Regions:
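Contiguous, non-catalytic segments that form substrate-binding/exosite surfaces or channel walls
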Residues: 2-176, 184
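Sec/Tat-exported extracytoplasmic proteins
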Residues: 6, 85-88, 197, 201, ...
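Short, glycine/acidic-rich hinge or "gate" loops at secondary-structure transitions
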Residues: 12-14, 96-100, 209-211, 235-250
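Extended, compositionally biased alpha-helical segments that mediate assembly or anchoring
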Residues: 46, 55-57, 76-78, 99-101, ...
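Alpha-helix capping and helix-loop boundary segments enriched in small/acidic/polar residues
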Residues: 177-188, 209-220, 240-243
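Active-site recognition of the HExxH zinc-binding catalytic motif
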Residues: 190-207, 222, 227
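An active-site-proximal "capping" alpha-helix that borders the catalytic cofactor pocket
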Residues: 215-232
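Long, well-structured alpha-helical subdomains associated
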Residues: 227-332
Length: 367
């Protein structure tokens, strides 16, 4: 394990490299280990014997070419990370991977993917826009290691005419017309940058006690970091007012799902929780016929409120509290269901496979 940790620590320092090679080790797919927390007798035995339960890793691989121009854009946010850390709720009650006082242990690269395999390339709903690794449970973070953000260029670009047509069709069917001018699919990228760096902010220890809810709560936290810091970063000059508004509306629109997720789907469960939370606090509104309106001026304020509650749950290390928090907000409303039906009519596809033509070409040794 310590060799893995040393490798992770070194990998997270590599900034100026032409290629990206990653063996991903994430445990979102392990639905069994985290349930140990719910067995009180077993959980007590483990604690009495100082045994920490860590979810099983699923191995994946990623190979890509680092895009220098894209990387330089991403690195702009690095100057603002200490300020973001300083503005986190309850910042004095935990240690962050990024702090306002220490060197920033965070590298970032923008990558054109060549190959994804194993867990990364599995048949599923989609490949994430980026990854921030190693995760909190990894040993390297206990020996001074940092983290590395890798952004996937092809995943965020909608280049085909069919893709652009589908986007417009979605807007026409679910978003109130006056908000169309604020929707910009390129604004997913700055939001994702905030999300990935959000994983390096907040508590990095104690979250394992939240069991099967830890990933849902952590993903929720990362989103709310990105959203709640928008006003701060706009004031500091990283974003314009127009970009801020576009990020907010694009986020809210893309948060609408075409089916109710299972509790094991952390990324999608957190989306339902956010939608319900924003509905309750009147930051968004969904009409009975399934059209979304966004209270642009209220979104950041409500996001910070949700972020504060999430940090409280993480700091508690209380499984029951985490369970209650998820169940309180994982509510699939009739309005969400109406939007989902409309989205399904546009596209029924839930999962997909990858095409890797360059990798196939290279594998066949044609060059």
């Amino acid at each position: 394990p310590m060799l893995d940790a040393q490798a992770d620590k070194k990998w997270a320092t590599l900034q100026d490299t032409p290629l990206e090679f990653t063996i991903t080790r994430e445990n979102y797919s392990d639905e069994m280990t985290e349930t140990v927390i719910e067995n009180k007798k077993l959980n007590k035995l483990l604690k009495d014997n100082n045994i920490e339960v860590i979810s099983k890793d699923y191995l994946g691989a990623r190979v890509g070419i680092v895009n220098k121009e894209g990387t330089n854009y991403i690195l702009k946010v690095k100057d603002y990370l200490p300020l973001m850390a300083e503005n986190m709720p309850y910042k004095d009650k935990y240690t962050q991977v990024i702090s306002s006082k220490d060197d920033i242990s965070q590298t970032m690269v923008d990558v054109d993917l060549i190959e994804v395999a194993g867990d990364v390339g599995a048949f599923r709903a989609g490949i994430t826009l980026a990854e921030n690794l190693p995760n909190n449970d990894k040993l390297s973070l206990t020996i001074g290691g940092g983290r590395r953000n890798v952004y996937h260029r092809q995943i965020r670009f909608a280049t085909s005419e069919d893709a652009k047509k589908k986007i417009q069709e979605r807007l026409d069917n679910i978003l109130v017309k006056k908000f169309h001018k604020y929707y910009d699919d390129t604004m997913d990228h700055p939001f994702t940058i905030g999300h990935e760096n959000g994983h390096s902010l907040g508590p990095k220890e104690g979250c394992e006690a939240l069991g099967k809810y830890k990933s849902i709560i952590e993903e929720n936290k990362a989103d709310m970091v990105s959203l709640s810091m928008l006003d701060l970063l706009t004031k500091e000059g990283l974003y314009t007012k127009e970009e801020r508004d576009k990020i907010i509306v694009t986020f809210a629109t893309d948060n609408m799902l075409k089916t109710k997720p299972k509790l094991s789907q952390a990324h999608r469960v957190r989306t339902v929780m956010q939608n319900y939370y924003f509905l309750l606090h009147k930051a968004i509104k969904i009409s009975k016929d399934g059209f979304l309106s966004v209270n642009i001026d209220k979104m950041v304020e409500v996001a910070y409120k949700m972020l504060t509650e999430i940090i409280e749950v993480q700091l508690s290390g209380d499984f029951k509290r985490g369970e209650k928090y998820v169940k309180d907000y994982f509510v699939w409303t009739p309005e969400m269901k109406t939007i989902a039906k409309k989205l399904k009519k546009i596209s029924k596809r839930l999962n997909g496979t990858t095409e890797q033509k360059l990798a196939d070409y290279l594998f066949e040794e044609k060059i």
